[in-house]
């Protein structure tokens, strides 16, 4: 998830 990480 973009809200949690930069790759997913």
UniProtKB/Swiss-Prot annotation:
Q: What does this protein do?
A: Mediates visceral muscle contractile activity (myotropic activity).
Pfam families in the record, alphabetically? Kinin
Instruction: Provide GO CC annotations from the record.
Output: extracellular region
Name this protein carries in UniProt: Kinin-5
Task: Report the record's Gene Ontology biological process terms.
Answer: neuropeptide signaling pathway
The places in or outside the cell where this protein is found are: Secreted
**Family (UniProt):** Belongs to the kinin family.
Q: Which UniProt keywords apply?
A: Amidation, Neuropeptide, Secreted
What InterPro entries does the annotation carry? Kinin_peptide
Answer yes or no on keyword Lipid biosynthesis.
no
Which residues does this entry mark as bearing Glycine amide?
8
């Amino acid at each position: 998830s973009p809200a949690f990480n930069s790759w997913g």
